[in-house]
UniProtKB/Swiss-Prot annotation:
This is Fimbrin-1. Cross-links actin filaments (F-actin) in a calcium independent manner. Induces the formation of actin aggregates. Stabilizes and prevents F-actin depolymerization mediated by profilin. Key regulator of actin cytoarchitecture, probably involved in cell cycle, cell division, cell elongation and cytoplasmic tractus. Residues 392-621 are annotated as: Actin-binding 2. GO terms for biological process: actin filament bundle assembly; actin filament network formation; circadian rhythm. Constitutively expressed in roots, leaves, flowers and siliques, and to lower extent in stems. Residues 7-55, 59-94 form the EF-hand domain. Residues 627-664 are annotated as: Disordered. Keywords: Actin-binding, Calcium, Cytoplasm, Cytoskeleton, Metal-binding, Repeat. Pfam families: CH. One of its GO terms (molecular function) is actin filament binding. It is found in: Cytoplasm, Cytoskeleton. It comes from Arabidopsis thaliana (Mouse-ear cress). One of its GO terms (cellular component) is cytoplasm.
């Protein structure tokens, strides 16, 4: 492990307000404005702060200059880095106040792809989160010795430090995500075991749709409150919104009005569907307003009163709507909900305060308990809206991968969300920096159809420059939502990204491109170095379905990560499934960011098999690169010996093995995308 410490701040409280990613970014900005004397003054700060994303949407440079002038100091006064951080926090707090406490970066759910620089998560939200944990994990065989937690104490932040609780909570949000056999669950874990749990947690959180771009394993090991609460809130949100789609709840089709299209409902994110459901019932109940958020529009509790009267008239209390005091009305609403068997998720005070996090969870809880939708023939066709299983799995994989990149947009449905081209341009900018001409791009909302086509045409143009196979593919195909073409394009993007990551670590290849054959040969050699005879001929090799090759590969790159007592022979379908589930969790525990499902291994989905193998290779080469760097910087014999002893697999020849394969050529993965896109293009031209 690296001995890197990061940016250190002498004030522990101040240090706790930022992640290392944030501190490094802010330190870089601070250093960039130093004058010739190596100093930073107050007058240097307004232009800098005005460019920071967390402040630029709220304040102009002149406003920031005025606020800094209120500090009462001479503008030529030197500002230390710690003073810079304190001033920044003060400005963030003013930004939150100006936007009514709901600054775009202050969401306690850590909305996808936003920065955590502004962590204004109300401490009161911790209580409901703790109650949620007590409710869903209270009977867990391992955690029941620590539960229930006291909502008024800091027990939560202590318990998360070993990583077990968060891993278990991920499985509550999306059952089966983590093979719990891979979680280290001894009562006392050593630092290495705790780090493995946190790594497994973060990679699994990404795999269910959480944004963790600013959270590291060390943040969880230290139990940093704002980051812990942010991650927990995302998991709770995913859990409570899981059924807000036509596939899980086909009755939702009842929400459609005559002018609405099913496609319109399909493209709505879950929270928007929940609002649509709420307004549907409010309209039936005679409520005159439209609820557009889970905060200000619910503060007076009137919408809640109307909603519950429609859903559960048998528990209606006339005093609720007659109440003049919002707090009193909120209390009566909660009593009504309890009579419906909705346990209290928030307090009357939190309704009146407008906590969007807790209100969303409460409305979702009401939906689950009693959605008030009819079960008749009207929604029967929604149940028949079945998609190809492999298409659904691929869409899920690409959606999660895109959301893990840290782009500004968030993808809810790949086939709908990429049609204006903007998200694809954001992805291209991530995987191939500076490839996008933003002057010729249109940002959503885009009203003019030709602007969408322009965006998509640029996507196709860049794809061809990157040597993607896009024969007879035009931007309009994306705008029209051609699923096969979109999947083919996304596969090439994902593969290109992985190969670029691998290429960046191969210093001995002299710029030669990485190929699929390189990855295949590396995997076979790695397994062979451990004395195993298992070898595969391609990423379509049917023997891969047993899972044994991948378990041996994982064991070869890090022997301690595989517990062979948990491995089956992989002969029956059940044994293959057990091995595949274990492989996915072990890979994530190791540090691989993978989005495939166990079924992809059992069925030998060659695309996902390639990405899994490449991810393991990337982790192995990355560790070798890091160890080589540490060894070079320390020039210590002791360190070198320790590094060698801790890595049984010979890592010295890691890059030599790979570079020796550079002459091997393959078109395995590209060919698959080529044939898929070419076939669809031909079909389109025939039609």
């Amino acid at each position: 492990m690296s001995g890197y410490v990061g940016v250190v701040v002498s004030d522990p409280w101040l240090q706790s307000q930022f992640t290392q990613v944030e501190l490094r970014t802010l330190n870089s900005k601070y250093v960039s404005v130093k004058n010739q004397n190596g100093k930073v003054t107050i007058e240097d700060l307004p232009p800098l702060f005005a460019k920071l994303k967390a402040l630029s949407a709220t304040f102009k440079e002149d406003e920031i200059k005025g606020m800094l002038g209120e500090l009462g100091s001479d503008t030529s006064t030197d500002v230390s880095f710690e003073e810079f951080l304190k001033i920044y926090l003060n400005l963030l707090s003013k930004a939150a106040e100006k936007s009514g406490g709901h600054h775009k970066n202050s969401s306690s759910f850590l909305k996808a792809c936003t920065t955590t620089l502004l962590h204004t998560i109300y401490q009161s939200e911790k209580g409901p989160f703790v109650q949620h944990i007590n409710r869903y994990l209270g009977d867990d065989p391992f955690l029941k010795q620590f539960l229930p937690l006291d909502p008024h104490s800091n027990q939560l932040y202590e318990l998360v430090k070993d990583g077990v609780l968060l891993c278990k909570l991920i499985n509550v949000a999306v059952p089966g995500t983590i093979d719990e056999r891979a979680i280290n669950t001894k009562r006392v874990l050593n630092p290495w075991e705790r780090n493995e749990n946190h790594t497994l947690c973060l990679n699994s959180a990404k795999a269910v749709g959480c944004s963790v771009v600013n959270i590291g394993t060390q943040d969880l090991a230290e139990g940093r409150p704002h980051l812990v609460l942010g991650l927990i809130s995302q998991l709770i949100k995913i859990q409570v919104l899981a059924d807000l789609n036509l596939k899980k709840t086909p009755q939702l089709v009842e929400l459609l009005e005559d002018s609405d299209d099913v496609e319109e409902l399909l493209r709505l994110p879950p929270e928007k569907v929940l609002l649509k459901w709420m307004n549907f019932h409010l309209k039936k109940g005679g409520y005159k307003k439209t609820v557009s958020n889970f905060s200000a529009d619910l503060k007076d509790a009137q919408a809640y009163a109307f909603l519950l009267n429609v859903l559960a008239p048998e528990h209606c209390d006339p005093a609720t709507l007659d109440a003049k005091d919002p707090l009193e009305r909120a209390e009566l609403v909660l009593s009504h909900a309890e009579r419906m068997n909705c346990k209290r998720y928030l307090t009357a005070e939190e309704i009146v305060e407008g906590s969007s996090t807790l209100n969303l969870a409460f409305v979702a809880q009401i939906f689950h308990e009693r959605n008030g939708l009819n079960k008749d023939g009207k929604y029967a066709f929604a149940e028949m809206m079945t998609e190809d299983v492999e298409t659904c799995r691929d869409e899920r994989c690409y959606r999660l991968w895109i959301n893990s990149l840290g782009i500004d947009s968030y993808v809810n449905n790949v086939f709908e969300d990429v049609r204006n081209g903007w998200i694809l341009l954001e992805v291209l900018d991530k995987v191939s920096p500076s490839s996008v001409n933003w002057k010729h791009a249109s940002k959503p909302p885009i009203k003019m159809p030709f602007r969408k086509v322009e965006n998509c045409n640029q996507v196709i143009k860049i794809g061809k420059q990157l040597k993607f196979s896009l024969v007879n593919v035009a931007g309009n195909d994306i705008v029209q939502g051609n699923k096969k073409l979109i999947l083919g394009l996304l596969w090439q993007l994902m593969r290109f990204h992985m190969l670029q990551l691998l290429k960046s670590l191969r210093s001995r290849t002299l710029g030669k491109e990485m190929t699929d054959a390189d990855i295949l040969s590396w995997a076979n050699r790695k397994v062979r170095t451990m004395g195993r005879k298992l070898q595969i001929e391609s990423f379509k090799d049917k023997s891969l379905s047993s899972g044994l090759f991948f378990l041996n590969l994982l064991w070869a790159v890090e022997p301690r990560v595989v517990n062979w007592n948990l491995v089956t022979k992989g002969e029956t379908d059940d044994e293959k499934r057990l091995n595949a589930t274990y492989i996915v969790s072990v890979a994530r525990k190791l540090g691989c960011s993978v989005f495939l499902l166990p079924e992809d291994i059992v069925e030998v989905n060659q695309k996902m098999i390639l990405i899994l193998t490449a991810s393991i290779m990337y982790w192995s080469l990355q560790r070798h690169s890091r160890e080589s760097s540490d060894s070079s910087s320390t020039q210590s014999t002791t360190t070198t010996c320790t590094s060698t002893a801790s890595s049984p697999a010979p890592s010295v020849t890691e890059e030599e093995e790979v570079s020796s394969l550079s002459g091997e050529v393959t078109s395995l993965a590209v060919g698959d995308a080529v044939s898929e896109i070419t076939t669809v293009s031909e079909e389109a031209s025939i039609e």
